[in-house]
Amino acid sequence: MAVLNIYNLAGEQTGTVEVNDAVFGIEPNKVVLHEVLTAELAAARQGTASTKTRAMVRGGGRKPFKQKGTGRARQGTIRAPHMVGGGVTFGPHPRSYEKKVNKKVRNLALRSALSAKVAAGNVLVLDYDGIETPKTKVIVNLVNKVDAKQKQLFVVGDLIKDYNLYLSARNLENAVILQPNEIGVYWLLKQEKVILTKEALATVEEVLG
């Protein structure tokens, strides 16, 4: 079974924990990772880009000049797509870019991403009894001690209990704090170190195991 190191808030290793190989020890499926990552990035798009067709542009109701006798090419409206100020042909309109991803496929992608992180030694467990008052320097000291100085993904099990941890970590420039139900492939791949609280680890194993 895969084994994760357990640390306290001081950054000292206090033990290890065996985790479910079905969640943290599988062979990463790159095809599924790409599919789910693409879907997550697509779903994050606003989809508000909009243009007006010739039917939507103001004006252009009358023929700009007579059909014959001017020597110019015939025109029926000043709002045709080839005219300055005219409508746009095949331009974007508000739409949803979301792609359907089956639950089993998404879970496989999450397990693949977590397994890749574990194989690289970039997942650790945080065991602590809470923080009395929010202090960013406590978290700075922690990430320095566990060699997680670059980009950190904190996964907390209970945002009420872990609220001071959230307040302490959110000041870090490259830190992201999520709950287990918010974890996505994008953040697992983007952030260098994944730091799970014990409660979050139990939830992740229960949901994905």
Swiss-Prot record:
GO terms for biological process: translation. GO terms for cellular component: ribonucleoprotein complex; ribosome. Pfam families: Ribosomal_L4. Transmembrane segments: none annotated. The keyword Ribosomal protein applies. It comes from the Bacteria. Residues 50-75 are annotated as: Disordered. GO terms for molecular function: rRNA binding; structural constituent of ribosome. InterPro entries: Ribosomal_uL4 (IPR002136), Ribosomal_uL4-like (IPR013005), Ribosomal_uL4_dom_sf (IPR023574). Residues 60-71 have a biased composition (Basic residues). Gene3D superfamilies: 3.40.1370.10. Keywords: Ribonucleoprotein, Ribosomal protein, RNA-binding, rRNA-binding. Part of the 50S ribosomal subunit. HAMAP family: Ribosomal_uL4_B. One of the primary rRNA binding proteins, this protein initially binds near the 5'-end of the 23S rRNA. It is important during the early stages of 50S assembly. It makes multiple contacts with different domains of the 23S rRNA in the assembled 50S subunit and ribosome. PANTHER family: 50S RIBOSOMAL PROTEIN L4, LARGE RIBOSOMAL SUBUNIT PROTEIN UL4M. Belongs to the universal ribosomal protein uL4 family. This is Large ribosomal subunit protein uL4. It comes from Fusobacterium nucleatum subsp. nucleatum (strain ATCC 25586 / DSM 15643 / BCRC 10681 / CIP 101130 / JCM 8532 / KCTC 2640 / LMG 13131 / VPI 4355).
